[in-house]
């Protein structure tokens, strides 16, 4: 089976930066090391960190004194960071710089009197963190979902960094018809836009697509959605253990894409399985 791997498959720059920080801290810390929430949305990578002795907590109140707290790639709620600093805990900030951008925009524009609208998933750690930096009310709009009435003349629209561009534009356009002043700041990260464009191109060239990454990874789910719109034979898996030979009946070429939090070794595991797949009717 021929396998075409997307150029952008695997760790993005921001995730690799955070992973390297965690490994460095784990190697040199004199006390316990924990991440504030899963460091990235990939169960296989989190398991590797656990093997290195790095734990995961949901709140600073769960850790003891002398613990080093690493902030996850998606950032953290400001109040939790304040609690950690108030206790004198060592905090290593692993927040992706692209995530810090919407945090700063929300803080600045809310201070200027704008009602901040965020296009994304209200339950995602990144969005919870961004909201905590706003100095005024925020409204989160789910992509494709209804847009509530917002009692404000000035509205600022930002996006979850992994948002699909068309979803962001749709919300901006709808709000522009309702409000006198709408300020839109595209906070979708460059890697996300490149990765999504790469996935679209790949899906047009192959007989099936496999997207690899955590089922809890927003950017991976979006890649699968994008590919499926073009190539209906698209599957989202976490590892090669989920693959089934019958999915690829009649396929000559399979495309392989992966989310920004998918480790290289997981991508290679899936690629190896696909390359070794025997197609009926071939020697």
From Swiss-Prot:
Give the active-site positions: 126 (proton donor)
- EC numbers on record: 1.17.7.4
Asked if Iron-sulfur is a keyword of the record, the answer is: yes
- Any Pfam family: LYTB
For the keyword Transmembrane, the answer is no
Enzyme class, one word? oxidoreductase
Q: In which pathway does this enzyme or protein participate?
A: Isoprenoid biosynthesis; dimethylallyl diphosphate biosynthesis; dimethylallyl diphosphate from (2E)-4-hydroxy-3-methylbutenyl diphosphate: step 1/1; Isoprenoid biosynthesis; isopentenyl diphosphate biosynthesis via DXP pathway; isopentenyl diphosphate from 1-deoxy-D-xylulose 5-phosphate: step 6/6
> Cofactors per UniProt?
[4Fe-4S] cluster
- Which residues make up the binding site for dimethylallyl diphosphate? 41, 74, 124, 217, 219, 261
Recorded catalytic activity of this chain's protein:
isopentenyl diphosphate + 2 oxidized [2Fe-2S]-[ferredoxin] + H2O = (2E)-4-hydroxy-3-methylbut-2-enyl diphosphate + 2 reduced [2Fe-2S]-[ferredoxin] + 2 H(+); dimethylallyl diphosphate + 2 oxidized [2Fe-2S]-[ferredoxin] + H2O = (2E)-4-hydroxy-3-methylbut-2-enyl diphosphate + 2 reduced [2Fe-2S]-[ferredoxin] + 2 H(+)
Question: Which CDD domains did the record assign?
Answer: lytB_ispH
Q: Which residues bind [4Fe-4S] cluster?
A: 12, 96, 189
The GO biological-process annotations, alphabetized, read as: dimethylallyl diphosphate biosynthetic process; isopentenyl diphosphate biosynthetic process, methylerythritol 4-phosphate pathway; terpenoid biosynthetic process
Where is isopentenyl diphosphate annotated to bind?
A: 41, 74, 124, 217, 219, 261
Q: Which GO terms describe its molecular function?
A: 4 iron, 4 sulfur cluster binding; 4-hydroxy-3-methylbut-2-enyl diphosphate reductase activity; metal ion binding
Q: Which InterPro entries match?
A: LytB/IspH
Annotated PANTHER family: 4-HYDROXY-3-METHYLBUT-2-ENYL DIPHOSPHATE REDUCTASE
Function, as annotated: Catalyzes the conversion of 1-hydroxy-2-methyl-2-(E)-butenyl 4-diphosphate (HMBPP) into a mixture of isopentenyl diphosphate (IPP) and dimethylallyl diphosphate (DMAPP). Acts in the terminal step of the DOXP/MEP pathway for isoprenoid precursor biosynthesis.
What is stated as this protein's family in its record?
A: Belongs to the IspH family.
In Swiss-Prot or TrEMBL terms, this protein is called 4-hydroxy-3-methylbut-2-enyl diphosphate reductase
Q: Which organism is it from?
A: Anaeromyxobacter sp. (strain Fw109-5)
